[in-house]
Amino acid sequence: MDPNSDFDFTNLAGAAKPATAASGVKPAVAERSKFYNPAVAQKLFELGGSRERMAEGGVFFSENDKHSRGGLFSKAVVNKMFFIAAGEVALTVGGKTLDTIGAGEIFGEMSVITGAPRSATASAKTKCAAYSLDAEQFQNAIQKMPEFALMLMNMMFDRLRLVAARLASRSIAPGHGGERGLSIFDEATLLQLEAELDDAARLRYSSMQVIMHEGKPGAYMYVVLEGRVTISIKGSVVETSGVGGTFGEMALFDQARRTATATAETEVALLAINRNTLLALIAEKPAFAMALLRVVAERLRYMNSLLA
């Protein structure tokens, strides 16, 4: 699987590589995430989605399509994610087949979560029956089925751990890690979080103080209220989180050791959220779940770019 593949979280990054066109061999379908449960996905899409049918050769979406409301000389484009009930879908980049999606699988979720342009074209290899969800339908659906949001996050974190392990084995060129246009919690979400979490959840760190250590167990995720935090793997900075940014959430989901070190670049104020509080927020606040999915998806996209 292409390390920059970011539109099908049922696949593991780097689990399989597509054959070249010259080989004449059908690309292998990548290994599926151990966290993916097709029954949970089907229930969510049936609960909140719309039925779709696509003839053989029909296009679900095209590479570089991006969400737009349309205008006088352009048509509206609404990003949707899909669950395939029957049939097969080919994912192609630059005309080359990357993967094949079959019944029981989902695709197209990255653009719905982040609003980013499509990174591939999805076309029906056979006649397909599917369900679709746009961003509004998706947020409404996870309010009724927060377990799907948890499943999706676990799949993303599974991929992030693979990417982090690959980054740890190589040098990151200076200037490649840093602050970027990451989707962060907006002011309204931050105010809501501060209001709902007690004073004990607020922490302050001095400049250059280590907040969490790579390889150590983790009990909290953090939301930056003031200042900046640098995130590093094996001593190389991979990103910088500013106000509204999050870090440390991965260890709360899989309860594994930290994959990175976080250090206060300036004096910082943080919200510390433990596992039970995090799971409750996801279950009770679909807007929070959607915001966290967006943050994690953007991080996965960015970390993948460091491997390119």
Predicted regions and their residues:
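Cytosolic regulatory regions built on CNB/CRP/Popeye-like sensor folds
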Residues: 1-308
